[in-house]
Amino acid sequence: ASDVYKRQVQGQPGSEMIAIENPENVAKHWEDLGAENLHIIDLDGTIDGKTSLDVIKKILKEVSVPIQLGGGIRSIDYAKRLLDLDIERLIIGTMGIEHPETITQLSDEYGSERIMISLDSKDNRVVIKGWQEKIDKSPAELSNEFKEHGAGSILFTNVDVEGLLGGFYTEPVIELKNSVDLPIVYSGGITSISDVKQLNESGVEGIVIGSALYKDKIDLKEALKYQNR
């Protein structure tokens, strides 16, 4: 995972920052190590409302593996602009939750398999707007609603543990997996190879590893050995 902010790879809001120049080189590095998908979040768009579209285009030119991209998507026109760049999946958070009809429109035009809804969870309630606002629905409730609107997959982030390198909680993942018939990609608190193995056994489609890779807590090649076991 790479979070792009001010043309650098950075950490999550509120966590310790890891600044690395040239995001496109970082993306290429992970591809060269065997990553089969890349997870890119535009923190410029999320935090400042000013997108890093130029950096995103450079990354797309540099790598050949599929990319799922999110962050700062506040209009359906911008969403279409990103989908037209041939990213594999577009991750939509706040806009989709506040305006679910946009999910239906994008799904109808581009295919549900390219539309991923981002559900960030704190205390089993979904949070939006950069984790600043909590809504009174659980991830399981919203997942089923968005399946009806045409979302093709779920990115589930446990905000309680994201970026803290303290491990993850199994229960929220299992609850969501048992509640909705959609592919789930999990993010948040993945710290060790043991976490990778446990999540793979839970049946999620994929996992997002960020801080643990940059801080050498997890070796990517070792983690990939547990893929689809």
Question: Over which residues does each language-model region extend?
Answer:
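Short, small-residue-biased leader/transition segments that mark boundaries at the very start
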Residues: 1-5
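Structural preference for beta-strand elements that scaffold enzyme active sites
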Residues: 37, 64-68, 88-91, 114-118, ...
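Glycine-rich, proline-tolerant flexible connector loops at the mouths of alpha/beta enzymes
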Residues: 37-54, 156-166
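Glycine/small-residue-rich loop that forms an oxyanion/phosphate-binding "nest" at active or ligand-binding sites
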Residues: 44, 51-108
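Alpha-helix-loop-beta-strand connector modules within alpha/beta enzyme cores
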Residues: 48-68, 105-119, 165-192
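Catalytic cores of alpha/beta
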Residues: 67-86, 173-206
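C-terminal helical cap(s) of enzyme catalytic domains, especially alpha/beta-barrels
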Residues: 103-110, 200-201, 206-209, 213-229
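Anionic-ligand binding region
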Residues: 105-106, 113-115, 119-152
